[in-house]
Amino acid sequence: MRLTRMYEYQDDDYDYIVRYPSFFEQTEDSLMDKGSCRFSFWLDSTEVVQTAFVESNPDSLILEQAMARYASELHATQQRKGDGFFILSGHIHSDNGQLSGRRFYAKFVQHRKLWFVQTLAYPEECEQAVRRLIHEINDWKVW
């Protein structure tokens, strides 16, 4: 994945841009939700999913409050706060507990009463292979 060509998706509703690998496929039904997109790669039992979406902030949470709330909801084991954004990562959990071998990485960017979110879900054994995507998410600027 290190050398693959990256494509850009520009959201028509919110005008943000997401970069994704050329061999990922866009899920067409992801376009039905305003401000959302989903790209995925599936081979044998390996699935890597990159998503972006916009979420309202009805409680007007400040960055620290939102980071604490989402970290708790997602069972994040790592948190990092930046200027106008925060990043969470950890193992993916279902209602029944931790999913074996699956991880997530997510960046939340605050803009007024909205959260712009980009996530990556991947098998733990693919951590090195998805480093470039994690770097893309780290560098993601909404505008």
Residue ranges and their predicted role:
Residues 12-62, 93-97:
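Secretory pathway targeting signatures of secreted, lumenal, and periplasmic proteins
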Residues 63-121:
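Signature of long, low-cysteine stretches enriched in small and polar/charged residues
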Residues 3, 12, 33-35, 72-73, ...:
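Residues that act as N-cap/strand-start positions at coil-to-secondary-structure junctions
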Residues 22-26, 115-143:
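Surface-exposed amphipathic alpha-helical segments
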Residues 58-66, 129-132:
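Short amphipathic alpha-helical segments
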Residues 9, 18, 39-41, 49-54, ...:
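Hydrophobic beta-strand residues in large extracellular and virion-surface proteins
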Residues 28, 71-74, 141:
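Sec/Tat-exported extracytoplasmic proteins
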Residues 2-8, 36-38, 81-91:
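Short, hydrophobic/aromatic-rich segments at coil-to-beta transitions
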